[in-house]
Regions:
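Conserved, structured core segments of small domains
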Residues: 1-103
Length: 103
């Protein structure tokens, strides 16, 4: 299994902590089951340094495991932000070259 970081981009005017929002996130995390290795945390404030293009502010992160990038993307599609004007960035975590750890 590979490890992936999910970074969330919140929809405009998203309000953190509403009962409906909490229920949607809980349901999504429950549906991913053992794939979730670190549920992560929301981000209260963020900014970018350098040229990051025109992206929404960072809304939070999680860490999951999946067989490959396609499976990780399939899991990410259930994120409550998807379809509401927000989104998820999916990236595979790897050990740096020369770290001595197997990739």
């Amino acid at each position: 299994m590979a490890t992936f970081v999910l970074t969330y981009r919140a929809p405009e005017n998203y309000t953190l902590g509403t009962p409906d929002g909490i229920a949607a996130w809980t349901s999504w995390f429950d549906s991913m089951g053992a794939h979730v290795t670190d549920a992560g945390k929301p981000v209260a404030a963020s900014t970018t340094v350098g040229d990051c293009g025109d992206i929404r502010p960072l809304g939070g992160y999680s860490v999951i495991t999946a067989g490959d990038l396609d499976e990780a993307v399939a899991l990410a599609k259930g994120c409550p932000f998807v379809g509401q004007g927000g989104g998820v960035e999916v990236g595979q975590l790897v050990d740096p070259p020369g770290s001595g750890d197997p990739a």
